[in-house]
Design a protein with these regions (language model features):
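Acidic helix-start/capping segments at beta-turn-to-alpha-helix junctions
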Residues: 1-19
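Extracellular (secreted or membrane-anchored) zinc-dependent metallopeptidases
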Residues: 1-7, 25-132, 136-266
Length: 267
């Protein structure tokens, strides 16, 4: 899959900056979950969106919670092409806009973060963007935040209790601080090691896992899943394996609630 910066807006006007449309807003920061919700106060921001069947809309602004890097709407599927874990409705079959912002949001506090001179940087914007776009095209977290619910519908991804992992990681950091006065380096493989729900340790490397992680792979099941979304998703740009006019003829008017990815805070 290849993402390209748009050269023109939906009306055919050439953009001064490829992929960028700037808007002056009245807020200095905004609750990211509220921004993507159906809250009536968001309708004015929905007007900023470009045609959802031709563009992926990325909203870049300062979040009220500095510990959240990004957030995203999940893909919406027509009922005839439903996919486990995603909203299934014919209400989006023919629409090109919603009454509220729909897309991915990135916390602009971190938009200039890089790989940090060869050292791992959990705020690296490229990883955040890749993770959120994964949500937008239908991928779920490969971990469970509490307990061991393997709920990403991909049998070939590792799963762990992320809350347990972060608690153990803090103990590991505290132990290093006591032994070495905080000057001891730890490798990325070491801090990315989790104990899976099957009791087997592994080094996390999946883009849909979370800090700390190599974040450079997807699995076959994940590829199958996002290919299904790309080929049939209601609000996803690109060529489809279904007659669009046929989908539009089945469009319904029921209201559907957006499904938002909830990524853990980084603290």
């Amino acid at each position: 899959i290849q993402f390209e910066m748009a050269l023109m807006d939906e009306n055919g006007n050439i953009l001064e900056e490829p992929g960028v449309i700037r808007h002056k807003v009245s807020f200095s920061n905004y609750d990211c979950e509220k921004f993507l919700s159906e809250d009536a106060s968001n309708s004015k921001y929905a007007e900023y969106a470009q045609n959802l069947k031709r563009y992926i809309n990325l909203y870049v602004y300062r979040f009220t919670d500095d510990n959240i890097l990004g957030i995203s709407d999940m893909a919406v599927m027509p009922k005839n092409y439903a996919l486990n874990g995603l909203v299934s409705t014919n209400a989006a079959n023919s629409i090109t806009k919603t009454d509220y912002p729909f897309g991915c949001c990135i916390n602009n506090k971190y938009i200039y973060e890089t790989e940090n001179d060869g050292y791992y940087n959990p705020y690296f914007i490229a990883i955040t963007l890749g993770h959120e776009l994964g949500h937008y095209i239908g991928l779920l977290h490969s971990f469970s935040e509490n307990g061991c619910d393997d709920n990403d519908y991909c049998e070939d991804t590792h799963s762990c209790d992320y809350t347990s992992y972060t608690k153990n990681l803090k103990l590991q950091f505290d132990s290093l601080s006591v032994k070495y006065g905080g000057d001891k380096y730890i490798t990325l493989d070491q801090i990315s090691t989790r104990e899976g729900c099957d009791g087997i340790q592994y080094v996390a490397d999946n883009i849909m896992d979370y800090v700390y992680c190599l974040s450079d792979t997807i699995t076959g099941d994940q590829r199958t899943r996002f290919n299904h979304v790309l080929h049939y998703g209601s609000l996803i740009p690109g060529p489809k394996l279904v007659d669009i006019s046929s989908l539009s003829s089945r469009a319904t008017s029921e209201v559907f609630t957006p499904q938002i990815s909830n990524c853990p805070s980084i603290k």
